[in-house]
């Protein structure tokens, strides 16, 4: 019984130590298919390698939040860092600008990454 309590305590201490680790998210913004003006596509924002899991992600059109956005379930990698995919349908053109804005404890202010149609 004492051995079980000691092991349980060790596990709890190890898990609480994970919360102290902070890793900034890597942000990648891309379209599902090569961009063609007037042709429907999907805009993706892949956010990975972050810890802790609390994060806010917004897709933007001309600096304004896009309301109809879907996302994957929060998942974690072998190193216990987290990743998410946010996406929405959009139709690219020459006048609109798209971006992904991320708020995380590792950033003093939200970070915005613009979509580059040539990537």
UniProtKB/Swiss-Prot annotation:
Pfam families: C1-set (PF07654). The keyword Secreted applies. InterPro entries: B2Microglobulin, Ig-like_dom, Ig-like_dom_sf, Ig-like_fold, Ig/MHC_CS, Ig_C1-set, MHC/Immunoglobulin. Disulfide bonds join 45-100. Its main location: secreted. It is found in: Secreted. Residues 25-114 form the Ig-like C1-type domain. Residues 1-20 form the signal peptide. GO terms for cellular component: extracellular region; MHC class I protein complex. Keywords: Disulfide bond, Immunity, Immunoglobulin domain, MHC I, Secreted, Signal. The keyword rRNA-binding does not apply. GO terms for biological process: antigen processing and presentation of peptide antigen via MHC class I; immune response. Component of the class I major histocompatibility complex (MHC). Involved in the presentation of peptide antigens to the immune system. Belongs to the beta-2-microglobulin family. Heterodimer of an alpha chain and a beta chain. Beta-2-microglobulin is the beta-chain of major histocompatibility complex class I molecules. This is Beta-2-microglobulin. It comes from Plecturocebus hoffmannsi (Hoffmanns's titi monkey).
